[in-house]
Amino acid sequence: MTAFRLVAVALVVVVACSTTWARSLEGSSSPVASLIRGRSLSKRANFDPSCAGVYNRELLGRLSRLCDDCYNVFREPKVATECRSNCFYNPVFVQCLEYLIPADLHEEYQAHVQTVGK
């Protein structure tokens, strides 16, 4: 009976400590705290902080893939970075769009840029 009480008390102490510790991490913005709370740091891997519009993973993925394809065609490092600059609102993105995407889809891609952009 004494062993049971000791285990019960130990369990209560562990739960109380873990709850207090978890609460102390709620206000923390460190990467470790984010992982502990069960949030993935890679959820917004394609997210560009210059994009002030609607966060839409699918649209950002499509726009980012266009830049990746453009880089794969031209193999110039500046293409990959400049294509994504200013949240895809730049001349390099437009050139990649014109080179790789059929003309009837250009307006759709421009609308995507407007949605995720400024």
Curated annotation (Swiss-Prot):
One of the record's GO molecular function terms = neuropeptide hormone activity
Using the record's annotations, give every residue carrying the modification Valine amide: 116
**Signal peptide from the UniProt entry:** 1-22
Key words of the record = Amidation, Carbohydrate metabolism, Cleavage on pair of basic residues, Disulfide bond, Glucose metabolism, Hormone, Neuropeptide, Secreted, Signal
Name a GO CC annotation attached to this entry. Answer: extracellular region
Per UniProt, subcellular location reads as:
Secreted
- Per the UniProt entry, the disulfide pairs are 51-87, 67-83, 70-96
GO biological process assignments:
circadian rhythm; glucose metabolic process; neuropeptide signaling pathway
Function field: Hormone found in the sinus gland of isopods and decapods which controls the blood sugar level. Has a secretagogue action over the amylase released from the midgut gland. May act as a stress hormone and may be involved in the control of molting and reproduction.
The protein's name in its UniProt record: Crustacean hyperglycemic hormones 2
